[in-house]
Amino acid sequence: MVSVPTAWCSVALALLVALHEGKDQAAATLEQPASSPRARAAHLRLRRCSCSSWLDKECVYFCHLDIIWVNTPGQTAPYGLGNPPRRRRRSLPGRCECSSARDPACATFCHQRSRADAVGVPGSQSSADAFQAGKTWATPGELLRTLRDISAAKTHFAKRQQEATREPRTTHSRHRKR
């Protein structure tokens, strides 16, 4: 009869041998594609087109085919985009530039107006939508005035909250202590 520790040792040894053999097979399959000079280069992400702004999330989602999108509380952020040269981004005339001129869906998407511009009425967009569409403030001082107004409103609200907590609460006559 075989003792229990001996049985466990033989099972563990068989498992290690099987894992070691599987490791050799996996390494052989990984070496085959790496032997070509093109595969040794850095991983290039598949792109249908190049967006002129990373803030245009609809364009980034359309153009970059293998992006992993990470959900964060404030926004959905693309993971693994990399950082292309700024000169190329600035030189793009429209929303994006297609990598293949024979792609009609890409040409239609890149040369049409953005959805926010097509649907919205001028002046009805939120500041976030206007920022995503690439628009700037009408006057240089408008942003500063808006921030000052927000700050004043927050200060006023904080003062009112403090005054409300300082006022003594009136209790009902039946609940007063004698």
Swiss-Prot record:
Source organism per entry reads Oryctolagus cuniculus
- Which positions are cleaved off as the propeptide during maturation? 25-46, 70-178
- Keyword vocabulary terms for this entry: Cleavage on pair of basic residues, Disulfide bond, Secreted, Signal, Vasoactive, Vasoconstrictor
Task: Please give the name of this protein.
Answer: Endothelin-2
Q: Which residues cross the membrane?
A: none
Q: List the disulfide bonds.
A: C49-C63, C51-C59
State its role.
Answer: Endothelins are endothelium-derived vasoconstrictor peptides.
PROSITE patterns, A to Z: ENDOTHELIN
The record's InterPro entries line, in alphabetical order, gives: Endothelin, Endothelin_toxin_CS, Endothln-like_toxin
Is Electron transport found in the keyword set?
no
Query: What terms describe the molecular function in GO for this protein?
Result: endothelin B receptor binding; hormone activity
Matching SMART domains: END
The region called Disordered is annotated at 154-178
Looking at the UniProt record, the site noted as Cleavage sits at W69, V70
Specify where it is mainly localized: secreted
Give the UniProt subcellular location, in the record's own words.
Secreted
